[in-house]
Amino acid sequence: MARETIIHVEDFTAAYEGSVILSEVNFDVYAGEVFVILGGSGCGKSTLLKHMIGLYKPARGRILIDGADVVAADRQERMDILRKFGVMYQSGALFGSMTLLDNVRLPLEEFTDLPPEAIRLIALMKLKQVGLAGFDNHLPSALSGGMQKRAAIARAMALDPRVLFLDEPSAGLDPITSAELDELIVSLARNLKMTFVIVSHELASIFAIADRVIMLDKKVKGIVAAGKPRELRETSDNPWVRQFFSRQASLDG
């Protein structure tokens, strides 16, 4: 049975002030998988993510989310596309003066016509799904970094998106908290049938959560390897893969 393609990136090229950052990138993301965009600093990971969610238009190419063209969409079509995905940026970006409940309510108030009580109940359910039941009236400053990340994921899930984009979700977390967040991501993907697209450079997280990986390289300006993470590490003869894993091992050591 053919897998459902939820994201299709075709001949994608990104440029900034005349300089090409990524060139002729092609890949698909399948529904229900955890898909990781891996690479070192400056390779274009976050640039690719920002184009995928429609913040920028590529120099060339197409990006389809659930069949809708992010690049060619008009205003109404873009609003429809926005409902299909949620985003958690690296900072988490919770509003510090608002409770967790109010933070999670924001997308529902902005993009739906639901009555206040229905919005409140949905927001409470999202907090429960990320392990934050009972913390709805807490301010972000009262929570640990890991709990703030969970709250940011809950907000990104508010509209029941088909895809969640996470930019370096483990950034700033200690190894134990990072592992707990990995477990949450896998649980959400499997139990809620959600698709995750994650930008990361951390190997431990990748092997814990990823179904498939693409590896970007700054010099090549594109994909140098793609596949299941353990296959890349254990069986690949790709020199770019070996170099990346060797560099990461030395940093971890």
Predicted regions and their residues:
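Helix-to-loop junction immediately C-terminal to a conserved catalytic motif
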Residues: 53
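Conserved ABC ATPase "signature" region
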Residues: 69, 116-134
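Conserved ABC ATPase signature
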Residues: 139-143, 147
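A short, proline-enriched helix->beta-strand linker immediately N-terminal to the Walker B motif
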Residues: 158-162
